[in-house]
Amino acid sequence: MRYLVISLFAVSLLMAGSALVGNAADAAKAPKKAIELKHGTSKRMHVMFNHTTHKDIACEQCHHDSPAPDKPYASCTDNDCHATPGPRERDTMSMFVAYHAKDTDRSCYGCHKKMAAQHPEFTGCRPCHMSQQARKEAAASEKK
């Protein structure tokens, strides 16, 4: 019994270690520059998304469909994943819902809502939707 417990513990450590290595490899593939998400009707509603800021979150949290094991994660609108048109469609396949679903931490809004207690700056729309910080990042990425 003792050897069984020790063996199971060793196997669980190996599995946890390999998961961490996988996340590190995924993080290395992530884009270094901020990405402007242009799915709103107004440029003021665009979002500057920086993968580096979100490096402690597993890629699968947002990119829940990987196109192929050897290919990096696809954009939300690739392969018609969240391509339903219309800014406020209640369809789970709409881009609006992918970003703004309230009751899940798989969406930007849901995750920020969950973390707002530790990070009060996560509340409201402006932290994402072309806030001063987002405008600075947009200007900096255009210069590069």
From Swiss-Prot:
Keyword Protein biosynthesis: no
GO cellular component, one term: periplasmic space
Residues engaged in binding heme c 3: H54, C108, C111, H112
Keywords from the named record: Electron transport, Heme, Iron, Metal-binding, Periplasm, Signal, Sulfate respiration, Transport
Regulation: induction: The trimeric FdhABC(3) complex is the main formate dehydrogenase enzyme in the presence of molybdenum.
GO molecular function: electron transfer activity; heme binding; metal ion binding
Pfam families given in the database record: Cytochrom_CIII
Residues annotated to bind heme c 4: H100, C125, C128, H129
PTM statement from Swiss-Prot or TrEMBL: Binds 4 heme c groups per subunit.
Function: Participates in sulfate respiration coupled with phosphorylation by transferring electrons from the enzyme dehydrogenase to ferredoxin. Gamma chain of the formate dehydrogenase (FDH) that catalyzes the reversible two-electron oxidation of formate to carbon dioxide. The gamma subunit of formate dehydrogenase forms a c-type heme.
Leftover remarks: The second heme binding site has an unusual CXXXXCH motif.
Self-association and partners: Homodimer. Heterotrimer of cytochrome c3 FDH2C and formate dehydrogenase FDH2 alpha and beta subunits that forms the FdhABC(3) complex.
Name of the protein: Cytochrome c3
